[in-house]
Amino acid sequence: MMKKLFSVLMALCLLCTAASALAEETPTWEKMPLVVTVDEDVELTDADFEGDWIADKVFYGTDYLTPEEVEAKGLAIRPVRIAGGKVINIVTDEAGEHEVSAEYTLENNQILFTDGEGIEAVFEKLEDGNLVLSLFVPAEGDTPVCVTYFMVHPET
């Protein structure tokens, strides 16, 4: 009887350990939500993108970056507001909090804009209702690297 009880307890411990390891698993590119495909029957509007957004996960190419790695690469994780035909970055620095904005165009169900540093960027809607922001930043040589921010509403 004790052997069976011990076996059951060990099995439960192993199950809990495995579940814990899975819960803390590093995000992978393959497990991220898919972009809404361009469908002739679906026409996204500005309202589909509007609101406040924060970065949930960041990828450099297809490699996941921790917040420390994002900072080490000189990239920023800033809240973003999309409203009134503009993409607005909420920047907090030594001067305090201020907004930096860029006008965008909505084409083929994507928001296209160029930030203040000349970096081209694209927002796309995800199948889960969130957004993905792709920035094409200079890297070694002449080849830009795509930095991808998976954006969610702050309350989620």
State where each predicted segment sits.
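Positively charged n-region of N-terminal signal peptides that target proteins for export
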Residues: 1-9
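Bacterial N-terminal signal peptides
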Residues: 9-17
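Sec-dependent signal peptide cleavage junction
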Residues: 16-31
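Edge beta-strand at a domain terminus
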Residues: 27-42, 101-109, 137-156
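N-terminal helix-cap/turn-to-beta initiation motif at the start of protein domains
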Residues: 36-54, 82
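Short, solvent-exposed coil/turn segments at beta-strand boundaries
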Residues: 49, 80-88, 106-110, 124-132, ...
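Generic short beta-strand segments
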Residues: 54-61, 84-92, 116, 134-138
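N-terminal glycine/threonine-rich, aromatic-flanked beta-hairpin/loop signature
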Residues: 64-110
